[in-house]
A protein has these predicted regions:
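Structured catalytic-domain cores with a bias toward divalent-metal coordination
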Residues: 3-248
Length: 248
């Protein structure tokens, strides 16, 4: 209902059911929200949220952003948006990271074993997109951080991290993986790392779109240890800055 109300208030927004997720005792649609303000727009942006069902701030941020488009469509007159506000409806309903089959949807964009990843690829897999980003949360983090994929320039991500810090929110310093680590809230993921993840069959949605469909791709992460409204504020700050930077 929330999505329908926002979409109904703007003639340029459209809500589509792109497929149905079906499990024993559970069925739900996957929604795609499109904003097409005029023919011949300069930019096309894709963003997704809710691929992990226990990370609610991203899905809420996507809905709030859809509302913002409906209120001020003229602000985005040169931008076409494709938005997947909730990629894992079963996980969201049950507050669980995975889908009912136990698949991490955000590691399934190499093998496409899950219903959800298959539906998203079949609908949005062609691209290209000027920019793509995905909204997530981290139960182990203590602060905000952001991934950028195969992008040498840190100017934008530094600005986003600084804006988050200026709002009084913590910035993550200690996320360490096998080959990646956080440096003042930023994780640089090189292209060779994405190719490696493809070979291991563990591509995230952002890995997939960076490899095949967009030159500018980001993942926003907020710590679930903080209050929900704070996480939502951090997500929205990052989303607004990403969109503004690539639509100037």
């Amino acid at each position: 209902m929330y999505k329908r109300q926002a979409v109904a208030s703007s003639g340029s927004l459209n809500l589509y059911e792109i497929g149905r997720v079906s499990y024993p005792g559970f069925e739900a649609p996957l929604w795609r929200v499109l904003f097409r303000p005029q023919p011949g727009v300069k930019y096309k942006i894709l963003f997704s949220a809710g691929l992990h069902g226990n990370e609610p701030a991203g899905a809420e941020c996507a809905l709030r952003f859809i509302e913002a488009i409906a209120r001020s469509p003229e602000k985005y007159k040169d931008v076409a948006f494709d938005i997947i506000p909730l990629g894992n409806p079963w996980g969201w309903t049950h507050d669980i990271r995975f889908n009912q089959a136990g698949i991490d949807i955000n590691r399934d964009f190499a093998t496409f074993d899950s219903q959800e990843a298959k539906i998203i690829r079949s609908t949005l897999g062609k691209g290209p997109f000027s920019m793509m980003f995905d909204l997530h949360e981290d139960p182990d983090a203590t602060g905000f951080y952001i991934y950028q994929y195969g992008i040498e320039d840190r100017h934008l991500t530094r600005q986003i991290v600084a804006a988050i810090a200026d709002l009084g929110y913590p910035v993550e310093q200690d996320i360490k993986m096998v080959v990646l680590k956080t440096e003042n809230g930023i994780i640089d993921a090189p292209m060779w790392g994405l190719q490696y993840m493809r070979l291991t069959g563990q591509l995230s949605i952002t890995n997939y779109y960076r490899l095949y469909h967009s030159p500018y791709v980001f993942t926003v992460e907020t710590p679930t240890a903080l209050p929900f409204d704070d996480r939502l504020s951090m997500q929205r700050t990052a989303v607004d800055m990403l969109v503004d930077y690539y639509t100037k």
